[in-house]
Amino acid sequence: MELVVTSRETDKKSLLKKIRQTGGIPAVIYSGGKSLANIVVDAHVFGKFLSSLESGALSSTIFSLSYEGRTIKALVKDIQYQVTSYRVIHLDFEELIEDRDVKLNIPIRCINAVDCVGVKLGGSLRQVIRAMRVVCKPKDIVPCLELDVRSLGLSQTRKLADINIPAGLRPITPLKEVVVTVSRR
């Protein structure tokens, strides 16, 4: 996802309020744990993108930020919402550097849930874990991990160890944890 961002002033609440009123989202780009730049993201463009995104996929989405003539590859590390309207009011981006490891959550998608044997026998499919915490290089980031649940019967489970994890991803979450279960109703 490409975003054109602009520079902004720092630390004054009145300026942040004005940015939000004029259709912007205040944001910060971090690199190596330190603040790299204070920026403004177009709220309409980001909101439109966010509404088209699958649930949980934001954490593994790589953004190309066009900032002062250069392109910065980054992940969203934190997002703040307004309590009553659920409007995005602040973003934190983490710059991706090619040779540096990054920690992130990769969403887990259950595929073939409609054809699940346990569901056809009257069971209820419940996904317990929706994302796996991993460490990897930026080039190894995948949009999601898939778990085939077609053969899952009644009272059976699938663990993180059952997911085909691509080379380059090193799980932080213990692989013995249950991802999905089919229980009797």
From Swiss-Prot:
GO terms for cellular component: cytosolic large ribosomal subunit. InterPro entries: Rbsml_bL25/Gln-tRNA_synth_N, Ribosomal_bL25/Gln-tRNA_synth, Ribosomal_bL25_b-dom, Ribosomal_bL25_C, Ribosomal_bL25_long, Ribosomal_L25_dom, Ribosomal_uL5_bac-type. Gene3D superfamilies: Ribosomal protein L25, beta domain (2.170.120.20), Ribosomal Protein L25, Chain P (2.40.240.10). Keywords: Ribonucleoprotein, Ribosomal protein, RNA-binding, rRNA-binding. GO terms for biological process: translation. The keyword Ribosomal protein applies. GO terms for molecular function: 5S rRNA binding; structural constituent of ribosome. Belongs to the bacterial ribosomal protein bL25 family. CTC subfamily. Part of the 50S ribosomal subunit; part of the 5S rRNA/L5/L18/L25 subcomplex. Contacts the 5S rRNA. Binds to the 5S rRNA independently of L5 and L18. This is one of the proteins that binds to the 5S RNA in the ribosome where it forms part of the central protuberance. This is Large ribosomal subunit protein bL25. It comes from Chlamydia caviae (strain ATCC VR-813 / DSM 19441 / 03DC25 / GPIC). The lineage of its organism: Bacteria, Pseudomonadati, Chlamydiota, Chlamydiia, Chlamydiales.
